[in-house]
Amino acid sequence: MTSTEALYQHYLKHPVISTDTRTITKDCLFFALKGENFDANTFAAKALEQGAAFAIIDRAEFAINENCILVPDVLGALQALAEFHRDQLNIPVIGLTGSNGKTTTKELIKAVLAEKYKVFATKGNLNNHIGVPLSILSISHDIEIAVIEMGANHQQEIAMLCEIAKPTHGLITNVGMAHLDGFGGFEGVKKGKAELYAYLKKVNGYTFIYRNNPYLIEMSNAAGLNKIVYYGTAGENTISGELIDTDPFIELKWSFQEGTFNVKANLTGTYNFENILAAICIGNFFNIKPSAINEGLINYFPVNNRSQLTKTAKNNVICDFYNANPSSMMAALNNLKSLSAKHKTVIIGDMFELGDEAAKQHQEIAKIAYDGNFDELIFIGENFFAFKDQNNGMFFKTRTEAYQYLAEHTISDSLVLLKGSRGMALEQLLPLL
């Protein structure tokens, strides 16, 4: 069996990692991970044929030659290798988690820090037990600051990811009604996210906290954090902010000891105010000039269908269909209500991973949508469909049924909110809007 130290020597010579034979590049290291429906040990030979330098496997019968490296467990080896690499990096690592806004906040932080530093940030949402190790192993030795996104759907997952990423600084964007099934309810969500605070307490790291969020204050007090940097709209904050406008893009005023500044970002949604303020706070902490902070924010444009305002031939569409939970859905509906438009349309899909709370949460969101007095309501998915007799609007069990309806009933000159869980794939409706 090969040790982590020996495997690291291979990594130094071949620093590109692949876990999928469809993404093999010449001289990469192929890690043969297992999934529910596959065992990549069976693809080791194919990976080598396609140009991988070595295949890391945990089943000896697939060791076809000396380029197959046998380890006790491939996932464990990947995580241990990432942890070993992290130990060689003497840089600040900002660990980031939360129920909503993780990826947008990560990208905002990266945009601000990149005004002064060479920054690595998690690509996309590689934020789980596989994605975090892959992210850490993507940090080259010329990187000056790293921003690592950490996601979780059950307790002890953030704690485990912290042992790999070893953040020196941290931020929880918020805690909300997300992954309730895995966490065992909202209190479980709070406990799970607070594992980042517990780790930062252990290593005496810095924590950035939105003072206006009572849950974060409660969690930070329970953790007994020593080094806190506050941002918010009230109280004694290192960075204080004031929302000026949200129609359609966010404009805010922010201040600290040296002065007050204004910035208009390319983000829609009141809920992004605190995400922008977090990036400002972290930029200021790392000694980036106010003008450069604003420059980074102005030059950031959302991607991956998170709060993107898209102008189509017929409508203005808020593309927020990357994911959804009750907290983010409520925020999106409230945001739509606050925006100016002659005609407003809501198209929302089911929210997943809510467990026993699913019926209650979908019923509440349907009521909020109805009470918003929007011009058109379209609900998609079996969870929403269960309440079709209790609310006005169009209800469809499947996206396919909704597609057929939209193909026959044109929506035009409207401000449209398009939002649902990733599995609903509501982006497929966008061409009809």
For the regions a protein language model found, what residue spans apply to each?
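Active-site beta-alpha connecting loops in nucleotide-dependent enzymes
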Residues: 33-38, 303, 322-392, 421
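Phosphate-binding loop of NTP-binding sites
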Residues: 77-211, 215-224, 283, 404, ...
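ATP-dependent carboxylate/acyl-activation modules
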Residues: 96, 304-306, 423, 427-429
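N-terminal leader/targeting and accessory segments in enzymes
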Residues: 1-80, 84, 268, 337-341, ...
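Mobile, glycine- and charge-enriched loop segments
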Residues: 21-32, 119, 134-145, 333-355
